[in-house]
Amino acid sequence: MSGHSKFANIKHKKEKNDAKKGKIFTIIGREIVMAVKAGGPDPNNNGKLRDVIAKAQANNMPNDTIERGIKKAAGADSADSYEKAVYEGYGPNGVAIIVETLTDNKNRTASNVRNAFTKGNGSIGTQGCVSYMFDQKGQIIIDKEECEMDADELMMTALDAGAEDFNEEEDSYEVLTAPDDLGAVREALEAAGVPLLEAQVAMIPQTTVELTDEKSLKDIQRILDLLDDDDDVTDVWHNWDE
């Protein structure tokens, strides 16, 4: 199961530079609110909140900022409220794109997402128009440099905990699970001292689309860049073979 992953570069990764860090912190803050309101402020009893905290720490969010966010979300007078909205559509040459958002204004978000597709010569479709082309999987990303285990030991630890697949990339490892098993596998890896960069439910494409002409490449990048710049967008999944 180890070796080069066909899933490499499937998710449009957000750059962790100064310009993007503010957006990442905004997204994580909203995810903390959603997690606390759904399952309470105690991460020991709230697996989703544990996942968000792990994501926050991987993105170097200060612990006091995380704690303030949890306390604020748990407060009786907290007025923060966000809805999850998912949009599906097509990029150039039929590239399938799924956009996940957390928003306090669905009309604004829908307009911005539609605008991103339009400017890249893509189109928004109906719910379900492309999601059938993806498999929902638990996805755990591990930094090679930070991991003291070798690939074989890490793979066995993950598989013994219930993982479905293990892939080795140039600078990271990827562990895939059934969505319902993500928490158990994450906890087993954490208990073994494995530092996690990310643990989330991901949309993994069943097949990929290659783009070769310059216009299509510019169009898809335009769509992804505009979505990346939108503070309401939390994740973008696509089947472009980058």
Task: Outline where the language-model segments fall.
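N-terminal cationic and glycine-rich segments that engage phosphates or anionic surfaces
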Residues: 1-125, 130-141, 181, 238
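Positively charged, low-complexity, intrinsically disordered RNA-binding extensions
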Residues: 139-242
